[in-house]
Curated annotation (Swiss-Prot):
Its cofactor is Fe(2+). This is tRNA N6-adenosine threonylcarbamoyltransferase. One of its GO terms (cellular component) is cytoplasm. GO terms for molecular function: iron ion binding; N(6)-L-threonylcarbamoyladenine synthase activity. Belongs to the KAE1 / TsaD family. It comes from Syntrophotalea carbinolica (strain DSM 2380 / NBRC 103641 / GraBd1) (Pelobacter carbinolicus). Its main location: cytoplasm.
Length: 342
């Protein structure tokens, strides 16, 4: 099946063409980072306006790069949620209009479902596996038994890991978004320079907490007489990142051991983090687990990642009606098969 996919849940407008749920023919992303960087975070109203300006352009670009005509498209998959309602509605409106005008099936897909299935676009990852979904809005562990079959194993109790990176970056005067900047500084710093807390590591569950690490760094910054810069800044960034990454790795590996799952997928925007990729890779190999990451281009929000689930749902006859609406809050374990049909 030749599928057109649309993503507009936050601050990236994306369209892709995916064949048979695995072959990415194009994946076009229009980023809004420069717009929101001025405000230190995503402004929902601005995000919606920028999506409206970009959505038709990215669709045209995706079709052109894939070298297919609009009439060749056999189905459409679109992010239904979770995310910013106004932003989601732009993608949904475009998807529904195209599905109606072309008389082709439509299916709404969960944003994080796209992320945790993204490695399947590039690698053979047999089910079942443990997925760490880690981004600016999510830090969850899921047991993935198949497409549409997800069970929550653990979750953040407060901030998501990506949110903590962004807040700490703002606190240190590094701007928005913060993940890439901190990762770059951390590579040149001493991760043992400061001992920031590792919350919940001694708890027997698989839940996360990152607000304590962020608060500890805030108190440290307030205790300094001058600005944190130079080698000092690099050491603070490295120590903060080390604390976050260590919590993510230890909790994930503990969950893998106790669930008996031998394969681990790490996905979402924070999966681009070089420190996380290195530590998870080394520790997983040491304990005999296979770990899979999407390539960096499939870690950030993108439309191609919707192709895996979208193709499977449509091939199975699971379609959405044209009255499909956005869901700003939508637990993934309530979004699998046959939920897109409802």
């Amino acid at each position: 099946m030749l599928l057109l996919t649309l993503e507009s849940s936050c601050d990236e407008t994306s369209a892709a063409v995916v064949r048979d749920g695995r072959q990415v023919l194009s994946n076009v992303i229009a980023s809004q980072i420069d717009v929101h960087a001025l405000y230190g975070g995503v402004v929902p109203e601005l995000a919606s306006r920028k999506h409206m300006e970009a959505v038709a352009v990215v669709v045209d670009d995706a079709l052109r790069q894939a070298r297919v005509a609009l009439g060749d498209i056999e189905g459409i998959a679109v992010t239904r949620g979770p995310g910013l309602v106004g932003a989601l509605l732009v993608g949904l409106s475009m998807a529904k209009a195209m599905a109606m005008s072309l008389d082709i099936p439509l299916v709404g897909v969960h944003h994080m479902e796209g992320h945790i299935l993204a490695p399947l676009l590039e690698q053979d990852v047999p089910f079942p596996y443990l997925a760490l979904a880690v981004s600016g809005g999510h830090t969850h562990l899921y047991r993935v038994d198949g497409i549409g079959r997800y069970r929550i194993v653990g979750r953040t109790l407060d901030d998501a890991a990506g949110e903590a990176f962004d807040k700490v970056s703002k606190l240190l005067g590094l701007g928005y978004p913060g993940g890439a900047v901190i990762d770059r500084l951390a590579a040149e710093g001493n991760p043992k320079a400061f001992d920031f807390p590792r919350p919940l590591l001694k708890k027997p569950n698989f839940d996360f907490s990152f607000s304590g690490i962020k608060t500890a760094l805030l108190y440290y910054a307030q205790s300094q007489k001058g600005p944190i810069e130079g080698d000092h800044l690099r050491d603070v960034a490295a120590s903060f990142q080390q604390a976050v990454v260590e919590v993510l790795c230890k909790k994930t590996l503990r969950a893998a051991r106790e669930t008996g799952l031998q394969r681990i997928v790490v996905a979402g925007g924070v999966a681009c983090n070089k420190g996380l990729r290195r530590m998870m890779g080394e520790r997983s190999a040491k304990e005999g687990f296979q770990v899979f990451f999407p390539s960096p281009g499939l870690c950030a929000d993108n439309a191609a990642m919707l192709g895996v689930a979208g193709d499977a749902y449509l091939a199975g006859g699971c379609t959405s009606d044209l009255d499909l609406n956005a869901r700003s809050n939508w637990p993934l374990d309530q979004a699998g098969w046959p939920q897109p049909c409802r």
